[in-house]
């Protein structure tokens, strides 16, 4: 139900992959999630001694710059290979006149609904197509979604078993809110998501038994959940995980995430 009925279908389409960059400490991975759309992921190999696995960092504000982002830099310096990209309609691919009032992506999100393919579903397809481009490499994949991108990471993790560990930082705790959203994206809204797939804790449960880390979360108002609120919010989710395969931590800074990834 989540994939087809809610997100409009996120399975990568059989489009030819574009030519990758050379295997160097930094390379560009060019790929096409569907005809007419070309995206580029930048891969930075971890410093020696290199650790096994790759980490995909997602932000709906545009591509995370490894040299400018504390978490990305820490991951790189501790030997982890980091991949960053701008998803469609974000960052370098953003529509110049998209914002209306509280919604920075109002127009593109509205157009996606007209097409029957909610923007969140299109973003998940972008991620899954990148995984196709990486498939020649069998290293375990960790995906980290920052802020609103955490919901994208949750959906990608729920639908694609190639993602071994899903991490969200400061992301939405629940679609249900009695006040207008603050700091969120209209593109995260999909028709019938609550009716046919469930709320954020239900989406998070779909990732089990693979690893899931919730590193801080916010209400629709933008207010950060306390430790007690976080535990209560994801009580349903916890039931589907064994031991430390699920972690909910009110702190979402780089040091806290690094400790969890060890």
What are these regions (language model features)?
Residues 184-185, 221-230:
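Short, flexible/disordered intra-domain loops and linkers
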Residues 86, 169-170, 215:
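Alpha/beta-hydrolase-fold catalytic nucleophile elbow
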